């Protein structure tokens, strides 16, 4: 399964910024970006986010660059959260205003009761006049209570099912991202070792050529 686009993983403009920053560092923005965005959402404090980021990027960046990059990412993410919360609040206010405006335009026409309906109701009231108010109240209360319990149970079950589905989906997404990130991390580590070995071999060859030149002189 392909990793979700990092632009979608971060709130506001943070996703696009993170993608560009990772690309400038020579890291896969799709894999690292989605994983980093998930970590930032999960951790609760700035220190926890910094610690988590160090664990992700320690194998990819030099020590002198690591702390600066991690702090830069956390600061950008925090700024985007403030902007995102403000925009969300404005959207909620606008939605409430629109709803109130629509309700104000709705006119409810009172139902006209015919003379025949009035007579029928009067007859029914007279027929059941022997039923006490207390019994009516008890029956009505029992019925209302039962209905409320049923409706409440159905809503609660529906709500719990929805929450469980969302949590399971998020857990699966995190696991998939974690697996893909670990694979990419291992690939990057092997590549760095190969590059380091090749660099060392070039140094050795250059050293031998220099020594040969000195002997010839």
Curated annotation (Swiss-Prot):
Region (Disordered): 180-217
Keyword Coiled coil appears in the UniProt entry: yes
Keyword terms of this UniProt record: Coiled coil
Protein name: Coiled-coil domain-containing protein 43
Family: Belongs to the CCDC43 family.
Disulfide bond positions: none
Gene: CCDC43
Coiled-coil parts of chain: 34-135, 168-212
Stretches with biased composition (Basic residues): 205-217
GO cellular-component term (any): cytosol
Species per Swiss-Prot/TrEMBL record: Gallus gallus (Chicken)
Biased composition (Basic and acidic residues): 180-204
């Amino acid at each position: 399964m392909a990793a979700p686009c990092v632009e979608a993983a971060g709130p506001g403009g943070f996703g696009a910024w993170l993608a560009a920053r990772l690309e400038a560092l020579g890291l896969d923005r799709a894999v690292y970006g989605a994983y980093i965005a998930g970590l930032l959402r999960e951790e609760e404090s700035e220190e926890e986010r910094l610690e988590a980021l160090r664990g992700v990027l320690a194998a990819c960046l030099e020590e002198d660059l690591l702390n600066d990059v991690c702090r830069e990412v956390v600061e950008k993410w925090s700024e985007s959260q403030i902007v995102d919360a403000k925009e969300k609040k404005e959207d909620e206010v606008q939605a409430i205003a629109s709803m109130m405006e629509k309700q104000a335009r709705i006119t409810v026409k009172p139902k006209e009761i015919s003379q025949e309906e009035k007579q029928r109701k009067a007859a029914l009231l007279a027929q059941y006049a022997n039923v006490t108010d207390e019994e009516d109240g008890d029956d009505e209360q029992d019925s209302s209570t039962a209905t409320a319990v049923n409706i409440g149970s159905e809503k609660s079950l529906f709500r719990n099912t929805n929450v469980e589905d969302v949590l399971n989906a998020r857990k699966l997404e995190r696991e998939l991202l974690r697996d893909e990130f670990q694979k990419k991390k291992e690939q990057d580590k092997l590549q760095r070792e190969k590059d380091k070995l090749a660099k060392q071999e070039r140094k050795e060859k250059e050293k031998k050529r220099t020594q040969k030149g000195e002997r010839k002189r």
